[in-house]
């Protein structure tokens, strides 16, 4: 079933959301977040969960810089579409579809978009775009850090940390240093934990 397009306007975290519907939809959504005007549009979205959609042939238009990103696949969570803030310990894992945050410690927000579910246990994976010379530029090494990991990495300056579970009881914490848009592993910590632990 094809549904007609709708418009979602989100301002300062407040949104009027469309009701859940089964089948495919054409999704055309506009919102504002701390001065960033964004438009998300796709002609083929399919409900993965009640309020989580997988969208093919997606266009994300960033109006202030007049840039449009074309993605084969992007995911949109109707309740948690966009986050603008730090990727620290207070960040809520696995919720937000679009994230504006300073990833490389240069004081300027970069862009993170959920494009898959290649994280640990089918969790989200992302495309990372660093802001350079007035545009968001895709960064493959950073994007690869979101595959197979327990959550999106945490950022402290140019230091990134991310966790990955191996089997039932081994938890690995990786620390990377970001320099010239490339990542270098500087530390790996491993601990054995109980299967009931949040880490495992």
Name each model-derived stretch:
Residues 72-75, 138-143, 185-191:
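Beta-propeller fold detector
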Residues 118-122, 167-168:
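Short glycine/serine/proline-enriched coil/turn segments at secondary-structure junctions
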Residues 3-14:
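Sec-dependent N-terminal signal peptides
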Residues 30, 97-105, 153-154:
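Structural signature of eukaryotic scaffold interfaces centered on beta-propeller domains
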Residues 77-96, 144-152, 196-197:
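Repeat-based blade/solenoid architectures
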């Amino acid at each position: 079933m094809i549904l007609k397009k709708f418009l979602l306007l989100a301002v300062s975290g407040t949104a009027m959301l469309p009701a859940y519907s089964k089948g495919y939809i054409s999704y055309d959504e506009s919102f504002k977040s701390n001065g960033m005007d964004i438009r998300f549009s796709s002609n083929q979205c399919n409900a993965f969960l009640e309020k989580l959609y997988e969208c093919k042939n997606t266009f994300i238009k960033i109006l202030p810089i007049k840039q449009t990103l074309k993605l084969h696949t992007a995911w949109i969570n109707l309740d948690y579409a966009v986050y603008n803030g730090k990727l620290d310990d207070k960040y809520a894992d696995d919720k937000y579809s679009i994230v504006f945050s300073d990833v490389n410690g240069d004081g300027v927000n970069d862009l993170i978009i959920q494009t898959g579910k290649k994280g640990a246990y089918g969790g989200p994976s992302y495309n990372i775009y660093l802001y350079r010379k007035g545009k968001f530029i895709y960064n493959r090494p950073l994007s690869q850090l979101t595959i197979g990991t327990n959550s999106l990495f945490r950022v402290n300056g140019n230091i990134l940390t991310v966790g990955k579970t191996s089997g039932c009881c081994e938890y690995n914490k990786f620390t990377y240093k970001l320099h010239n848009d490339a990542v270098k592993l500087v530390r790996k910590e491993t601990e054995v934990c109980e299967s009931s632990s949040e880490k495992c």
